[in-house]
């Protein structure tokens, strides 16, 4: 999975897909009451990027629904995963549950259209810290209460704050989540990051019977040398400001026979058995 990073303006979707991404990440900004308003990162952000691009969240969902719906004029077959980077650190932790309700309802109304949409992308909920876990509980409660629990099959969980992996496992256990879990490891492209935690996550992913990590990705990679390093370690995905660079690295002799781009037929919730 090549995840285009910070794809917050509607016009950026095609831009990143044209560069080779098969997944996109966008930022969800909330008001003080936990209501999702816009796709927007804000300052500071990655080096060399404009931090201020944005769109109305519901309008963004309406567009991305079309882009991921077969037979729609806007359909792009390669886009199979949507990562929602939830900016919950900007609101009170007491509002995390309200935020989870709101995002679930907006996805129901504008992406899935309560069963009337054929939009097919998988959804990854990127949660900043484990203390925000009430967002997940609310999201799942809302799908159940609204009568659309089946959409849980399309939704995965990912904690992005580089916290202790055992601490994350404990929270997933509290929530009763034993599947459909990704684990991110990384830092803004402005800084270097070691591989200790990334290696630990990959080791847990590959441990038989360990159900709290199905996929691991590294972020935000812009240098080809770091992309190569991550691929050698065996990551499932790379988040990048430059998907075209990832494509070029994947075509190199060292990686061409070991990796390929994920398609819709690849289940993002299953561990890869090479």
Swiss-Prot record:
Report the top EC class in one word.
lyase
Instruction: Give the catalytic activity.
Output: an N-(acyl)-sphingosylphosphocholine = an N-(acyl)-sphingosyl-1,3-cyclic phosphate + choline; an N-(acyl)-sphingosylphosphoethanolamine = an N-(acyl)-sphingosyl-1,3-cyclic phosphate + ethanolamine; a 1-acyl-sn-glycero-3-phosphocholine = a 1-acyl-sn-glycero-2,3-cyclic phosphate + choline; a 1-acyl-sn-glycero-3-phosphoethanolamine = a 1-acyl-sn-glycero-2,3-cyclic phosphate + ethanolamine
Subcellular localization(s) per the UniProt record: Secreted
* Required cofactor names: Mg(2+)
The intrachain disulfides are 45-51, 47-190
Report the GO molecular function annotations: lyase activity; metal ion binding; phosphoric diester hydrolase activity; toxin activity
GO CC terms, sorted: extracellular region
Positions bound to Mg(2+): 25, 27, 85
Broad class of the protein's primary localization: secreted
Keyword flag Lyase: yes
Organs and tissues of expression: Expressed by the venom gland.
Please name the GO terms of the biological process aspect recorded for this protein, alphabetically: killing of cells of another organism; lipid catabolic process
SUPFAM superfamilies per the record?
PLC-like phosphodiesterases (SSF51695)
For this chain's record, the cofactor binding note is:
Binds 1 Mg(2+) ion per subunit.
Q: Which residue positions are annotated as catalytic? A: 5, 41
Could you tell me the EC number(s) of this protein? 4.6.1.-
State the InterPro entries in the record.
PLC-like_Pdiesterase_TIM-brl (IPR017946)
What's in the keyword line of the UniProt record? Answer: Cytolysis, Dermonecrotic toxin, Disulfide bond, Hemolysis, Lipid degradation, Lipid metabolism, Lyase, Magnesium, Metal-binding, Secreted, Toxin
Q: What does the record give as the function of this protein?
A: Dermonecrotic toxins cleave the phosphodiester linkage between the phosphate and headgroup of certain phospholipids (sphingolipid and lysolipid substrates), forming an alcohol (often choline) and a cyclic phosphate. This toxin acts on sphingomyelin (SM). It may also act on ceramide phosphoethanolamine (CPE), lysophosphatidylcholine (LPC) and lysophosphatidylethanolamine (LPE), but not on lysophosphatidylserine (LPS), and lysophosphatidylglycerol (LPG). It acts by transphosphatidylation, releasing exclusively cyclic phosphate products as second products.
Instruction: Tell me the protein family, please.
Output: Belongs to the arthropod phospholipase D family. Class II subfamily.
Q: Specify the protein name.
A: Dermonecrotic toxin SdSicTox-betaIIB1aii
Where does this protein come from, organism-wise?
Sicarius cf. damarensis (strain GJB-2008) (Six-eyed sand spider)
